[in-house]
């Protein structure tokens, strides 16, 4: 089966996400552009990065050079822990590095409950989605208690809870 033929999953907000994505965690920033370009060449259409990875610029260069129409791509990036009270500025920085006007999925990378800012960050992500800067919003590495707090405080459920296996 060609990677392009793999199905999409419909999220709770109605948007779709490719079932298979290419992640760039721990990828050398100097190699990111080349490796993402190859992933796109073989058919990947979902690229998963994060501000903390330090390689969003390489992802952006590969996307720009690929010639693939933006609407055919799905780009995920993540808000790092120290920016949870400043999600809008953090996303703007990521968008600049990626060379994009929006991301398809913006995630809170970790709940960091000791700081108590993940609900504030979530409220900001809701606004960013309304502004069109993130088509879908979600979380990463959240436990049930954190998810319950988001729903209790905002009535908006994350479209994704990305976890490591």
State each model region's role.
Residues 27-40, 83-99, 118-120, 145-148:
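Short, acidic/polar
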Residues 111-165:
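Beta/alpha (TIM)-barrel catalytic core signal, keyed to glycine-rich beta->alpha loops juxtaposed to Asp/Glu
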Residues 18-30, 77-85, 111, 115:
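Active-site mouth loops of central-metabolism enzymes
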Residues 44, 100-103, 134, 158:
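A structural motif
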Residues 70-83, 104-111, 162-164:
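A short, structured active-site edge motif that brings together acidic residues
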Residues 88-108, 127-131, 153:
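CE4/NodB-like, metal-dependent polysaccharide N-deacetylase domain
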Residues 1-3:
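Short, small-residue-biased leader/transition segments that mark boundaries at the very start
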Residues 22, 39, 47, 59, ...:
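Conserved, mostly hydrophobic/aromatic
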